[in-house]
Structures are given as C-alpha cells and as structure tokens.
C-alpha cells in the first residue's frame, strides 16, 4: 500500500475507471483519493462492518468511516500476521464458520500469532 502512488494513479484515471483498495489498512485513506471501495480480507471476517465503513465514506460520513477503520486496525494486523489466507481461515474456524483444514503449502498458524489473532477477534467482539 503506497498512498503516494495511489494518488498518482488517481490523478491519471478517467472518470469512468474505478479504483479499489486492496490494502485493508488503507481503505479509507485510498477512498479519500477516489477509490470506490475495497477488495478485502478483513471483509471475510467482518463483512457488514467493512460495508458500513465504505458506505459511510461514500455517504459523506468520513468521521464514522475513519472511526471504523481505526477500530478495525488490531484485527487487520492480526489477519496479516502470517501468509494470507492462513489467518483468515483460522479466524473463520475460531468463529465456527468453517473447519480448520489446511492443504499444502498452507499450514496452521504459529501459537503466538494464533493467540494474537484470538485476542483481536475477542477485541472486535467476534469471540467470547
């Protein structure tokens, strides 16, 4: 995620071209540069919240979008603590949405990053 590069690209785009954030930690900043939304790993775990954040920004409630972005940062960090999609699969398994099955070359998370992910899920209100 390079905000300066995104600004350069946004300047070059025609009005009919849509730019999307691919970096969960930068969705709101990139929307301020003209991104229409996001292609998100975070949304795999909190789809409604990510939708609400983008919708708030598009509706002009930048403060609400910013607050959601900032509040989501601990979970975003945890979701990128190991190679994608391992943490998101682990998160969904902990939430009871899928079984924790991994095919090569994927493997279970390390104990320390799994514990940090669990803490982030609890902090986000997704686990008891």
Please place each PLM-identified region on the residue numbering.
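Surface-exposed charge patches
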Residues: 28, 90, 119
